[in-house]
């Protein structure tokens, strides 16, 4: 170690994730009539609707919406205020939408401009004449998550290069040129991904890792033709979770009824285990889709959106890890890392090989934001091992080491239902660690830093396993025993000792300590 001063620069495991999603939409300029706003939400409270969507998925603060009723007012607002997104509802009364978009971008180069139509007749007319002027065009279908979808699609497009480069955030490509269909798909895809990501937060060891997981959710990128889809695949091949595509869409400037199948063939030739879902209104396409090792979904199905959600959940690593045999027979389920490790130790070797050959383990880890662990597993092939038992041993030991590393130097939020005795430093209850607890936590983190480990050869310095009862639990103890008033009065040591000795612990805290 060159200098003890270097320790001042040490960072937490999640510090490198802090720069994820650097671009966030904070202010939206919305151009609409009052009636159009009423159509979006019956009571007209668009901001409340957006706030509720952000709260549902535990997202950071929702953007502010500034509404104007004309293109002229919008251009004036762009000159005087900062906005990250412009949304135009239907057509404008005082200016051609394409002309408005050009002027808006002249004032604010690079600002995303999105058109939201209400009727198919508006949509066709607008797309025919002005589509190139807009970043995206959507049609309002009554989906309350539409506004959230537009925001996240724009943010993903801006952030994807940096976020994949920095930590390997994963990407899902949607290929669809029908505004009606992608206006239905995208809200469902974002809702499903955010819902599953939120569900994973209960597995996080503390609030820092919870924040990381929300920032590290997969990005969704939209392509409307073959060339754009192929370009996205080639750029983000290393980070792809999967592809969801129509079969019929433009290729070489002309509508091609086999474009999706050709795209799947090209991708599967290079990444054979990548999940691909192809969709068509023509059931006869199913056999051709099967021939290129992709899944098929009929667009005319009454359960289209439900089946799409099931595909995302099953193939992109969300939900429980379900150990199956090659014939689909379910053997066991793992809800968390400990259960995955336990199952890996005993599950049928045929199931272990089946999942390893398809990168199911690394996909499941990636969905949980565990990119480093996934990178340890993904390069290894089944053929690298002498037999399935050597594969089992490697997987078990890698998971065991990871669980230990994951706890090292970290303050873990105690949860009775998932406590397994591996945590080195626990916090029990809500609130602050307190001064002494915070000092111990800092020293524990410091001693797990590599610079300290190598500073004194032959010497191991560590903090004993620790549990800190936080201020929230202490406040509950004081309140339950009516000790707050007592503490504020003047009493001698014997009286204070007697009062606290005779007090009882809150039942929740007592159960935590017994665990």
Where are the language model's segments positioned?
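N-terminal beta-alpha lobe that positions the nucleotide/phosphoryl donor
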Residues: 334, 339-342, 347-348, 352-515
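Hydrophobic/aromatic residues positioned on beta-strands within the core alpha/beta folds
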Residues: 116-118, 279, 299
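Cofactor-binding loop segments of dinucleotide-utilizing enzymes, especially the Rossmann-like FAD-
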Residues: 33, 70, 118, 177, ...
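Conserved phosphotransfer microenvironments
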Residues: 6-10, 39-51, 60-62, 67-75, ...
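As written
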Residues: 97, 127-137, 288-296
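Short, charged/polar "capping" segments at the starts of alpha-helices
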Residues: 37-40, 121-125, 182-183, 284-287
